[in-house]
Amino acid sequence: MNAPAPKPGLVIVDKPAGMTSHDVVSKLRRAFSTRKVGHAGTLDPMATGVLVVGIERGTRFLAHMVASTKAYDATIRLGAATSTDDAEGEVISTTDASGLDHRAILAEIANLTGDIMQKPTKVSAIKIDGKRAHERVRDGEEVDIPARPVTVSVFDVLDYRVDSEFYDLDVRVHCSSGTYIRALARDLGNALQVGGHLTALRRTEVGPFTLNDATPLSKLQENPELSLNLDQALTRSYPVLDITEDEGVDLSMGKWLEPRGLKGVHAAVTPSGKAVALIEEKGKRLATVFVAHPNTL
């Protein structure tokens, strides 16, 4: 007999440094004994911290996960620019930054806060004509990614150190999805005319999920357990709409309900606590956008 499929849900991983996000997925596929594993929001190999991973039907929920905001703790080194905008690339220029005025640094940080246009780093997972930018760079192609709007709501300096010709900043950033912290380091260095790159990055929040929810990968490999089942994942991510058990059955079969004047997506929850689906008003219908518990399962 085949082993039963793992329960669907989310695993919040505290990713270690030195591996790709796909490496984490591969290890969790083995740990949970299923191919149905995927992640939301790529973390670079050098980065650590929150990586949201879906298991079984949880992979389908990832596309609907509210992750409009993310938070990071990072270290920026001013005085050197690299080919990748982080410590893993080759140093392409150096300029003595030890004499920088801290007030000038804070002024340029202020210019990189709020609604800004950001040019993503060339070595990124962004697809250009179906091929990821970092693959094109590796193959020797010239890559030019247009600037895009992002929001940096917090860009705070927690500490700083002057080390020889370098000026290191420990920073905390809260930003919209799609913001590159490496690009912030690069742009800050360019604005100060000394170059800059990222030397450390730890993601502390993805939407409603934080490091407090996260489990080290090594522990998950030893004891593979969900961080949240689908009911918990939906209600943690969206406002709740209470429905009857009968309405839950209808939604589980893909049927729609009468509109109730709702704005935005809600998690439809029955009296028994089952988050049956994500629903949204579309015209004169309250329709499903994701069914967590289909009637066929």
UniProtKB/Swiss-Prot annotation:
The name this protein carries in UniProt is tRNA pseudouridine synthase B
The disulfide bonds in this chain are none
Catalytic positions are 44
Molecular function (GO) terms for this protein are: RNA binding; tRNA pseudouridine(55) synthase activity
One GO biological process term: mRNA pseudouridine synthesis
Protein family according to the UniProt entry:
Belongs to the pseudouridine synthase TruB family. Type 1 subfamily.
Organism of origin: Corynebacterium glutamicum (strain R)
According to its UniProt record, the EC number is: 5.4.99.25
Instruction: Please explain the role this protein plays, according to its UniProt record.
Output: Responsible for synthesis of pseudouridine from uracil-55 in the psi GC loop of transfer RNAs.
Pfam families reported in the protein's UniProt record: TruB_C, TruB_C_2, TruB_N
Q: Which reaction does it catalyse?
A: uridine(55) in tRNA = pseudouridine(55) in tRNA
In terms of NCBIfam families, this protein maps to:
TruB
Its keywords, alphabetically, are: Isomerase, tRNA processing
Q: Which HAMAP family does the annotation name?
A: TruB_bact
Domain of life, per UniProt, equals: Bacteria
InterPro entries, sorted = PsdUridine_synth_cat_dom_sf (IPR020103), PsdUridine_synth_N (IPR002501), PUA-like_sf (IPR015947), PUA_sf (IPR036974), tRNA_psdUridine_synth_fam2_C (IPR015225), tRNA_psdUridine_synth_TruB (IPR014780), TruB_C (IPR032819)
Q: Can the keyword Isomerase be found in this entry's annotation? A: yes
